[in-house]
Amino acid sequence: MTAVFITGATSGIGKQLALDYAKQGWQVIACGRNQPVLDSLHTQYANIFPLAFDVTDHPGTKAALAQLPCQPELWILNAGDCEYIDDGKMDVTLMARVFNINVLGVAAVIEGIQPHLSRGHRVAIVGSIASELALPRAEAYGASKAAVAYLARTLQLDWRPLGIEVTTIFPGFVATPLTDRNTFAMPMIITVERAAQEIKAGLARGVSQLYFPKRFTWLIRLLGALPYVWQGRLVRRLLKA
């Protein structure tokens, strides 16, 4: 039996991954802030071990990760949040909230799990295709996910000689409680079940970078390669489609 560690396991992609891996017989360490949801996951599958902590509480995160109920070989860092800035009116408090979860929270978990990592392990970090192209109102979210992507790629360079692999995941729009809050068109949005399938398949293949859905993420990457003066017009047209 193999084991997987998942943060952000109380909703969305993380919850679906926890359920899917548990169905396949994996031992799952499901992490999140919502203790009742974690307990319900354990009720559904005895091989799901709940671990409650808040990634923004860095000492608490380190303490929670000091001893684990099993030894994972796969680590999926999925916890994150999204807030938007309206009309380009900078809000440093909002920026700090988003970065504290999406960037420093990832770093806190990495610091906590690092003593448990060894040769043959894989760490997957969930970013966003938003890091590849500037999108309206995404000053905080997009910048945080760009930072996460850089962090993951740098860790890949430093950890590969140690036999530890890193996968950076770049999802497009996925139907989750997080995207339910969006008030704009979300082209080519996919279900959380499909997103979990894409992630599991990509990690099983051992890819270093995983983009999905392919058509949408390819389009975003293509737009990101165009001259900047064209990008804004095309992005606004795409998000109104």
Residue locations for each model-derived region?
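Conserved glycine-rich cofactor-binding loop
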Residues: 10-11
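Conserved glycine-rich Rossmann-like NAD(P)H-binding loop of the short-chain dehydrogenase/reductase
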Residues: 24-40
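Rossmann-fold cofactor-recognition segment
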Residues: 45-59
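Substrate-binding pocket helix/loop in short-chain dehydrogenase/reductase
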Residues: 86-97
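Active-site helix of classical SDR
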Residues: 110, 144
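C-terminal helical subdomain
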Residues: 168, 184-219
